[in-house]
């Protein structure tokens, strides 16, 4: 038996989440799994803060095809990196590392499931990368860019929220394909990162642009072939005016809308017809069968320094609520990670 610190979800949220929507508590856990079960006891090392988690904070919505609401009074959960302490599962043994869905706590008891938990085979890269670059956000970038957008060399690519966990990798994939890529972000520091660290051809601070369509026209005088959508709202409206005929839009997220009581409408949808634009929403879970192919692409390039990644690290489980809430105010620079234990 040992103590187990946890981040508890207090109650369903409307509007922007606050740190006060969570409790920090300490309970106890037995360091063993029930005899005969296929459960695995893990020690959580790193936690991932992701925008999709906001969709789980509202009241349960029977009409939702995806998000299952967090239960008040229970630990919230998300992607993390963990070490196996004890296992009743045939595929995992003590000492194994994995990434996947775990509770926001020091120790979790999980039942590993395909496409929800992945054994870590490559440990010659930072383990924290499996919360981002080599985990769900990395696979999201890969699926949206290669599988949904079907890119071609020489095409033009626009990425919103481009300095985040997904966007920074989409931009690098685009450059690897020989595309012209522009990103937007919400601060000078982030814009500079896009151009100096991630190799974007151009970037702009959307907060300093009074006319988003004009900003896109400036960056894409010949139009946009592919848009990796992370924002929604006014940005999507402006993009539709600047898309080329037969352009493709991969809809990954709409972070500008998640905390609004009434979501903003999009007014330029007729462009989809006249320009024959293909818009496709996607969920990364539909593409996890391609994870080995994804690793074959990115692992060598990480080791060769051809792919780089920026993390914003919060130390300690007690910092997790602040880190998660900050995500929705643009406070993170790069992938937001919470370190529980460094091993």
Swiss-Prot record:
EC number annotated for this UniProt entry: 1.3.1.74
Chemical reaction(s) catalysed: an n-alkanal + NAD(+) = an alk-2-enal + NADH + H(+); an n-alkanal + NADP(+) = an alk-2-enal + NADPH + H(+)
Residues holding substrate: 52, 79
Domain of life: Eukaryota
One Gene Ontology MF term: 2-alkenal reductase (NADPH) activity
GO CC entries: plasma membrane; plastid
Cystine bridges: none
Binding site for NADP(+): 164-167, 190, 206, 230, 252-258, 282-284, 332
Pfam families cross-referenced by the UniProt entry: ADH_N_2 (PF16884), ADH_zinc_N (PF00107)
SMART domains: PKS_ER
Keywords of the record: NADP, Oxidoreductase
First-tier enzyme category under EC: oxidoreductase
Gene Ontology annotations of biological process type: response to oxidative stress
Annotated PANTHER family: NADP-DEPENDENT ALKENAL DOUBLE BOND REDUCTASE P2-RELATED (PTHR43205:SF30), PROSTAGLANDIN REDUCTASE (PTHR43205)
Known partners and oligomeric status: Homodimer.
General function of this protein: Catalyzes the reduction of the 7-8 double bond of phenylpropanal substrates, such as p-coumaryl aldehyde and coniferyl aldehyde (in vitro). Has activity towards toxic substrates, such as 4-hydroxy-(2E)-nonenal (in vitro). May play a distinct role in plant antioxidant defense and is possibly involved in NAD(P)/NAD(P)h homeostasis.
Sequence similarity: Belongs to the NADP-dependent oxidoreductase L4BD family.
Protein name, per record: NADP-dependent alkenal double bond reductase P2
Organism: Arabidopsis thaliana (Mouse-ear cress)
This protein's encoding gene: P2
């Amino acid at each position: 038996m040992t103590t187990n610190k946890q981040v508890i979800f207090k109650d369903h949220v409307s509007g922007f989440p606050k740190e006060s929507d969570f409790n920090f508590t300490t309970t106890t856990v037995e360091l063993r799994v029930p005899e005969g079960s296929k459960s695995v006891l893990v020690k959580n090392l790193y936690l991932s803060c992701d925008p999709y988690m906001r969709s789980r904070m509202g009241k349960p919505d029977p009409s939702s095809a995806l998000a299952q609401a967090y239960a008040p009074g229970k630990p919230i959960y998300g992607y993390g990196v963990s070490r196996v302490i004890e296992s009743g599962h045939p595929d995992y043994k003590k000492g194994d590392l994995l990434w996947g869905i775990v509770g926001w706590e020091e120790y979790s008891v999980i039942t590993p499931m395909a496409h929800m938990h992945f054994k870590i085979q490559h440990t010659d890269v930072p383990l924290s990368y499996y919360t981002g670059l080599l985990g769900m956000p990395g696979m999201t970038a890969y699926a949206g860019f290669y599988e949904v957008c079907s890119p071609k060399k020489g095409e033009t690519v626009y990425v919103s929220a481009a300095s985040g966990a997904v966007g920074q990798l989409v931009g690098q994939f685009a450059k690897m394909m020989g595309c012209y890529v522009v990103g937007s972000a919400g601060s000078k520091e982030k814009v500079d990162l896009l151009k100096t660290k991630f190799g974007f051809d151009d970037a702009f601070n959307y907060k300093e642009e009074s006319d988003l369509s004009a900003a896109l026209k400036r960056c894409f005088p010949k139009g946009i072939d592919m848009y990796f959508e992370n924002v929604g709202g006014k940005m999507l409206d402006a993009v539709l005016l600047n898309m080329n005929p037969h352009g493709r839009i991969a809809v990954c997220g709409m972070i500008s809308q998640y905390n609004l009581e009434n979501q903003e409408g999009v007014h330029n949808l007729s462009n989809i017809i006249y320009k024959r634009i293909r818009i496709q929403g996607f969920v990364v879970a539909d593409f996890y069968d391609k994870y080995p192919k994804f690793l074959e692409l990115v692992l060598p390039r990480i080791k060769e320094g051809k792919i780089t990644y920026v993390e914003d690290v919060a130390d300690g489980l007690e910092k997790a609520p602040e880190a998660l809430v900050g995500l929705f105010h643009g406070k993170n620079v790069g992938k937001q990670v919470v370190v529980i234990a460094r091993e």
